[in-house]
Amino acid sequence: MLDIARVAQDVEAREFAGMGSLKLVAPAKVNLYLNVKGVRDDGYHEVSTTMHALMLHDVLRMKIIPGTGEAVKLTTRSFEGLAPLDVDPQDNIVVKAILKLAEAFGRTLGEEETMRVHLEKRIPVQAGLGGGSSDAAAALLGSAVLWGESVLDSRIKEVAAQLGADVVFFLQGGCALYDGIGENLVRTLKPMNDFLVLVKPEGGVSTAESYKKLDEDPQPISAKDAEAAESAEYAMSVPLLNNMAKASEQLNPGIRTVREWLQEQPGVCNAMMSGSGAAVFAVCDSFASAAKVATDAQAKGWWARTTTFGPFKATLTTNC
């Protein structure tokens, strides 16, 4: 089985070898601070959140091929114990991102040219780690480069905002505070480089259901705590706060089980759910502690990975 997987990876690598192909990385993130406030007139929730990028990342390989009739041809492969993506490729946010940017740039895909994309998934879905949004941000950058456009073109950020607030963050990366519906950059913070463990129980959480449950039972963050989080200039100074945690833990009790277990482990400084879940992150005092916690979590049957905070963002790495 491993030999078959290696052969498949070799075939994929060869397809994207040579000039005209791009390789991009799409990092994960965690929310150090997430304060969901009231519902606006347009139906969206007002939020204030501090996001921090991580070294853990997906990889996108992209190139333009002669038109096949398809606007975008997307294939995916999951790594590190993740299940294959259970979504039609045409419904993937990567495809949506490319189509929206093509429209913004006035390009027609399908007949004369097709965007070929291969996505290597290492960030779990329904985890609150921003994997899909990061993939979309990377796809926007890759498409712009392949079409000969500047990655600083304002239309990229405009399309990112249409796709979702987290997509905007991954174009910026590092650590930053956002408000509005999560798309308005308030300030950047100095990133940290601490080690952390990501642990995800079985199942996920519907973000919509989590918001609904939070609306039924609001969990306001005190003005004092909100001020401490929103005035911080350094990532390490941000208090870990997430008022969606209770709602998501009720929807998926496994999140609470993971969080409470992490909080009891030696070397763990603090642990909290990221975003609307279902992943929980634990900041650790050393790599050795983080590695031990990850190993023990995997022994319990949970998906777990050690990684680091850092100044990462969706980025073109090399022509491959």
Put a short name on every predicted segment.
Residues F170-N270, D285-A291, T295, T306-C320:
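Conserved, helical-rich catalytic subdomain that frames metal- and/or nucleotide-binding sites
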Residues G69-L85, A139, A161, A232-L241, ...:
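Short, basic/glycine-rich phosphate-binding loops at helix/coil junctions
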Residues L2-A127, V145, E149-D153, E183, ...:
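ATP-binding N-lobe of GHMP and related small-molecule kinases
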Residues R116-W147, A165, N270-C284:
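Glycine/serine-rich anion-binding loops at beta->alpha junctions
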Residues E113, A136, L140-L177:
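Contiguous, small/hydrophobic- and glycine-enriched helical/loop subdomains that border
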Residues F16, A53, A161-Q162, V168-L171, ...:
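Solvent-exposed alpha-helices and their adjacent loops that cap or buttress functional pockets
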